[in-house]
Amino acid sequence: MAGGMSAECPEPGPGGLQGQSPGPGRQCPPPITPTSWSLPPWRAYVAAAVLCYINLLNYMNWFIIAGVLLDIQEVFQISDNHAGLLQTVFVSCLLLSAPVFGYLGDRHSRKATMSFGILLWSGAGLSSSFISPRYSWLFFLSRGIVGTGSASYSTIAPTVLGDLFVRDQRTRVLAVFYIFIPVGSGLGYVLGSAVTMLTGNWRWALRVMPCLEAVALILLILLVPDPPRGAAETQGEGAVGGFRSSWCEDVRYLGKNWSFVWSTLGVTAMAFVTGALGFWAPKFLLEARVVHGLQPPCFQEPCSNPDSLIFGALTIMTGVIGVILGAEAARRYKKVIPGAEPLICASSLLATAPCLYLALVLAPTTLLASYVFLGLGELLLSCNWAVVADILLSVVVPRCRGTAEALQITVGHILGDAGSPYLTGLISSVLRARRPDSYLQRFRSLQQSFLCCAFVIALGGGCFLLTALYLERDETRAWQPVTGTPDSNDVDSNDLERQGLLSGAGASTEEP
């Protein structure tokens, strides 16, 4: 109908909102036509394997700099607070780009968007290995471009998995996918440190990654499909029929989704702690080793730091075990306990806080105990990665998931790990400036700057307790086969049934 001449838009089909008025002077928005789509199970698992491999490389890129941080500080002559700014620039560019990629992922080819991101971050990473010490600002800029490329993948890949699998299958696949967060982080430390030791030059660590990323790009193009949005929930029919919503309407819907809001704040607390620990823990452990007299201080590159290898191996081991334990606990208990997923997240974060505190305060006394409690804290923290992703996919309607992922990434990073490495380094530098210059005082300054992490992670546990109050309601709304803008789901289901707007209990949509 042209020019808004008709009083009502045509009904989009069974289960749709019937006879919506477009308003004066406005055209009817184009309906989302369901398209039949199917994929053999083995193809879905192959696609998931490729996405997991790329996620591994993604997180290796995040933390490879931390594995060679001492060398970078020596080459570019930067202090702790400016070194923390490296990660802050990376994460800031990631969070600024995430809403853009979330918007594109909800409306355009997700496969093409991810491919562009891989090209961007691999090219910037390779270029950064050739930057002269005179142009330290250019090195910071290159890390920002790597963060921009990484945003495309972090935002879109979970939504593709959400459209390939459903229910228990999706929980298990997400568990495997998110295992590669700690595995990739740990391998980033290991690769950076090991390549530096083998070649005597930290720059080669940044030149190895683009080769692996070229393979990832080819596999993505050849083996990963771009399923219709909501395909898993609608038995291959694609997105639930209805009208396309604007980005502002999507954001307004998500702002009313309290499970999403509180879980996002919980993820923010996790990001704050993992960002600070991931960037500074290897240096903290090295300085503890120097204080204990187990290793001499480093005066020139290459700096030998066995703690990068140890912390990397610890991150991998605790990450794999933690993600599996968290996902399996969620899969089992959500069938018998309402709101089990956020309760699992809350319990693990509240238990992480004392572990981190003990790891910090015991480091000057016994390095072994510090490692034990640090490993236990990382294990408990890792229990949440797959679970929080499953919470998001279960409480958000399919056509808004890309935007939801983007907003969660943006908020989580802007209030979390965008500032925590810089803030930790800044506090350390301020404390050190007021004390005599000694290795013990350097260590104590960094130790005390870490203490805020234990408090922040406890706040995150409280946010997940609040998530549990709203989870069942928001899950029910997300599974309602309602069309129109996402805000139309914000209606009581009994009222919808009385109005004849629900077509039945099934999630599939049929063409009229």
Curated annotation (Swiss-Prot):
Role played: Sphingolipid transporter.
Principal subcellular localization: membrane
Transmembrane segments: 50-70, 84-104, 112-132, 145-165, 173-193, 204-224, 260-280, 309-329, 343-365, 377-397, 411-431, 450-470
PANTHER family registered for this protein in UniProt: PROTEIN SPINSTER HOMOLOG 3 (PTHR23505:SF3), SPINSTER (PTHR23505)
Localization: Membrane
Coiled coil: none
Protein name (record): Protein spinster homolog 3
Family: Belongs to the major facilitator superfamily. Spinster (TC 2.A.1.49) family.
